[in-house]
Amino acid sequence: MARQKIESDIVLIGAGIMSATLGLLLKELNPKLKIEIFERLDIAAAESSDAWNNAGTGHAAFCELNYTPELEDGTIETKKALKISEAFEVSRQLWTYLVEKGLLQNPENFIKSVPHMSLVWGNDNVEYLRKRFEALQQFHLFKTMEFSDNIEKIKEWAPLVMENRNSKDKIAATSMKLGTDVNFGTLTRNMFKYLETLEGVTMHFNHDVYGLKKREDGRWRAKVKNIATGEKKKIFAPFVFIGAGGGSLLLLEKANIPEGQGFGGFPVSGQWLKCTNPEVIQKHSAKVYGKASVGAPPMSVPHIDTRMIDGKKALLFGPYAGFSTKFLKNGSYFDLIKSIEFSNIKPMLGAGVKNIPLTKYLIEQVIQSSDDRLKALKEYVPSAKKEDWVLENAGQRVQVIKKDKDGHGILEFGTEVVTAHDGSLAVLLGASPGASTAVQIMVDLITKCFPEEVKTTIWQNKLKEMIPSYGQSLNENTVLCDQIRAKTNEILKLKV
């Protein structure tokens, strides 16, 4: 039987929040585009974007202390926090546009107001948090942040965290009422649900992309297999985006572009303790982030989180890190081995040598007992009882390993976009802050991969309609910032 051939304008690989965001933006900018979307699983957002596979934190740098490191001279670095906070405001604006236009329904199903808190104890950590608060206060985006080292005040903000806590402990916290909990799984599936109604958009579930090659005519040829039937297809398109979570690295290697040489991946798995006692769940209404242990990766910063999942309030603590050679929860144990190539073996070995503390930390996490996990939980919930909590597996994250200027390997704890020199291919690697900043990442990608189109009046006007702050800094334009926050709070039904 002849292999089916499909001609398209855009191919999106992976049905997660990134592909949904890019597909939606491109279709709004040019409704005539033909888009083919391929997903290995039988449902969208079942890997990294699923509600149980991530913390659901609307990352805005309100509470995540790893975004504001203390420098050697004692000052607080704020650049990353500012960038992430601006980016999350961009996400809120696009979601507001989609709700206002009726393209997304019931925003309360995917985003809820949940205060973001940072909590620390010990003299040095309290002093750090005070300095962090003062450093962020100079920026309008963080003006509504509150700081307190008063036990009674912190009890108001997070009673469960303070219950049975040693009153002699030196403790401090910050709180931002503007914080949110986001169900990226629901959001992603709703975005794809809308995309599927548009002419020219086709979604293919249970389809594995096993080949990717640049043709002489400048187009890409993707080889795709229907996992359910075994049927194979060839897809031809001038632009391909790979947003396949942990699976992106292997596809980048198949694409064989010069810009992708030297990249490697380090898989880190995660687990949560989920509370099963409704009385305990009701006592907590915040996302409380602490400080990471020495050697711990940034995504392992401990936090006790109120979640809203499928209309129900939930309470999670973690994440506990682990190690698996899989790049996806539904991946293969051979993923790590298959990812090793001549071009990346030196960076991967170099990154391993440089990250001995991380290796030690992961080993300790993997071998810890249920009592060890309870001990970690009790630092944030002193009154916790083992019988009220069950262990759940979270998502799989592949941290980026890339070459530094000397050709040695460095481990990057962030999101990395790799693009071909001609803009015909873009690949998203890495993890946090990921989903929260998806809109800004995709706008930047569009600017790089569609440079001529993005300069046109039509695209410029549409981008400003979807994202009113497009081309401006909300931190610098304080009036616009307040206006946009007021509108997004109203349309997204956020109670601040």
Swiss-Prot record:
The keyword Oxidoreductase applies. Its EC number is 1.1.5.4. The keyword Oxidoreductase applies. Pathway: Carbohydrate metabolism; tricarboxylic acid cycle; oxaloacetate from (S)-malate (quinone route): step 1/1. GO terms for molecular function: 2-hydroxyglutarate dehydrogenase activity; L-malate dehydrogenase (quinone) activity. Keywords: FAD, Flavoprotein, Oxidoreductase, Tricarboxylic acid cycle. GO terms for biological process: tricarboxylic acid cycle. Disulfide bonds: none annotated. It is an enzyme of class 1 (oxidoreductase). It catalyses: (S)-malate + a quinone = a quinol + oxaloacetate. Its cofactor is FAD. Belongs to the MQO family. This is Probable malate:quinone oxidoreductase.
